[in-house]
Amino acid sequence: MIDAIYVQERTDETDAQCKAAKEAWDALTDAQKELVSGENADPDYFGRDTGDASKDDPLNQDDIGENELLVVSFGTSFNDSRATDIGGIEKALQEANPDWSVRRAFTAQIIINHIQARDDEKIDNMDQALERAVDNGVKNLVVQPTHLMHGAEYDELVEAIEKYQDKFETVRIAEPLLGEVGSDATVINEDKAAVAEAITAEAVKLAGYDSMDAAAEDGTAFVFMGHGTSHTANVTYDQMQTQLEKLNYKNAFVGTVEGEPEDTACEAVIEKVKEAGYKKVILRPLMVVAGDHANNDMAGDDEDSWKSQFEASKAFDSVDTQIEGLGRIKAVQDIYVAHTKAALEAEPLATAGGSNSSAALEDGTYTVDFNTDSTMFHVNEAKEGKAELTVKDGKMTAHITLPSKNIVNLFVGTAADAQKDGAKLLDPTTDTVEYLSLIHISEP
């Protein structure tokens, strides 16, 4: 039954399946619960204590009013982290925007189902949240992602909003935590600097030091573990390493659980810390939420956890962990507040009744951003992620320059659509396509 709800798609049967799975679990004896198994099932699914779910507000109420601020997160089934990390951001945004109703959406249906089945807490997915907004007569919608970067999840969020944007008078999408990605590892910005300063300040305080320098003098290194991604935005982690070095935090190291390049893998980070001569290590997540990855991949007891791997190297006198997400840090919450403020002050996206449509653009040539979702990196690096947009007689044509003629299997659209039967792959040197999408003008 757990396997049946461990899926990313919600169906008409989901509610009944969640209820049935919990009833079946409750009917087992303690001894039987320890024997639960399946492709995605184990005793921890229902049995692990992750905190009091009643302390978390799912923010799925109606009576929204005309102005909604929808806070979109990947989500976590760890109750304490959900209430503290995600809830902390939501509360900060509500306090800063009293004339707007803050509501929540998660993008991970697997997590939504887990929480519903175990705790009977119902959290909206993107479609449910947007339908709720439409049904409540929302006119002005601002979407604030809690995502770390402009990765695949952010792209999927934008795609979901595209389907509903003509239902509102104005729609705005705010920046994720670390802002624009940039073209290579050297590109940093104010958001990355603010996050680097915030996370190191919290890390040294919790470790009992006055500063990063004091920790370094004591032989302590801080390793910040990110998720990682196959998206081109993975370069963000190298940019964070660059930012930490720019701040002269020589005892700060960034690694990732997944994705490339290999120099951010656990084994590579262990070697870097060892070569730098530090004998004490403190692991901390570079993640908005301290959920499954922080508790298991970083701090778990399994031999492949980062804590276990650092200990197994025999290179360090101590290896400790700090299981705290970025979302609970006030300085980080302030960044989200600033991003929402900037979105409110910016031009809205094009809507059916809005004035910010392609026809509103004067004829001419513009520079626009474009994103790629690929197992290859830097597909859009030829001109730092920029394309040339020509507007003539209300029609738009984008010319995209690729870094190499050898790049193949291109598809204009989403990664999900590219995998569908009949998806047409392009010859980048000759093919032209028509595709309706959100276009963000970066400079005229």
Each language-model region and where it sits:
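Extended amphipathic ligand-handling, pore-lining, and cofactor/metal-binding catalytic surfaces
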Residues: 45-282, 287-355
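Short proline/glycine-enriched turn/loop motifs at strand-loop junctions of beta-rich domains
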Residues: 403-407
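Transition segment at domain starts
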Residues: 357-387
